[in-house]
Amino acid sequence: MAVGGVDVRVENQLVRFVPIAPVNHDAVISQLAGQKNGNIVIKALQKPRATIIIDEAGRIVVHGTHRVEAARAAAKELLLRLGLDDSGLQTELGPVIASFNFDSGVAVESMNQEFTGGTSIYDQRLGCAIIQDTRHNLKLYVWANGKCVASDARHPNMVAMSAVFWKGKLQEHNLLL
């Protein structure tokens, strides 16, 4: 998705599905070789490729997809393999992880400062600047080569708007190289 000259790629989106009847942990373990881990059961699917987590309430959390349609297909696959009805499946969208590129270098080591719209610190361990974007309610990890990863976003469009906003802020503060 390109907005304002910035191409945003969704890397992952957590999606939770609430079936009419809760999914039984024991059924997933015995019928599909799911793995119990505390109060959850984990099952990796090959087609569609996804990791499915059955939470303590019997809801289905799908991890490892970047499209809601693929996550829904994974949840339906699980239900059908268990012999359960897949109708009435409610969808709840979780956070998005996305990436984009500023297409220029960034002086990340000089980004320990307050900006209108957020705060930035340089993380020496990661080798990037971390922007807590209060305007768009997400976090940006910015590397010196211009590569950026957004986490905690609620929608890809918010990442795109954040990318355009921060590109302008970095230009304004002479931090783009």
Say what each PLM segment does.
Residues 1-141, 145-147, 153-177:
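Intrinsically disordered, low-complexity polar/charged tails and linkers
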